[in-house]
Amino acid sequence: MHCPFCSAVDTKVIDSRLVGEGSQVRRRRQCLVCHERFTTFEVAELVMPRVIKSNEVREPFNEDKLRSGMLKALEKRPVSSDDVEMALNHIKSHLRATGEREVTTKMVGNLVMEALRKLDKVAYIRFASVYRSFEDIREFGEEIARLQD
């Protein structure tokens, strides 16, 4: 690590501590040239996989898009924003845990449907009707029947 005071390349770690519930490492460093001390923080960089759309176009994972889709389905439903954030974090963790560099929109959509099914059945039906392109009332009935099983 470069010294912020003299730009020397050689520094040594004097002290390391976990901070932020163990999600960060705080390090005290000392420059071996000018002997100044400074603090650095390290955080793991969690990379989300790219998303492959149905038309084969690949795009970066967009958390805002995921959130807005879920919030649209949950509109005027009695679900707390904390529950929505927990569901979003669960979906993101699941996607990262696949270890894949790319995931399909189908996989993301299925994870959203699973999360909504646990949060609110009405929101689940709303999302499923758009995601699965329900054509008529019969398809709504079939999905509701599956929910009741």
From Swiss-Prot:
Cofactor, how bound (note): Binds 1 zinc ion.
Cofactor(s) the record lists: Zn(2+)
GO term, biological process aspect, one: negative regulation of DNA-templated transcription
All residue ranges annotated as the ATP-cone domain in the record: 49-139
UniProt-recorded Gene Ontology molecular function terms: ATP binding; DNA binding; zinc ion binding
Pfam families: ATP-cone, Zn_ribbon_NrdR
InterPro entries: ATP-cone_dom (IPR005144), NrdR-like_N (IPR055173), RNR_NrdR-like (IPR003796)
Keyword Methyltransferase among UniProt keywords: no
ZnF segments: unnamed: 3-34
Family: Belongs to the NrdR family.
Task performed by this protein: Negatively regulates transcription of bacterial ribonucleotide reductase nrd genes and operons by binding to NrdR-boxes.
Protein name per its UniProtKB record: Transcriptional repressor NrdR
Gene behind this protein: nrdR
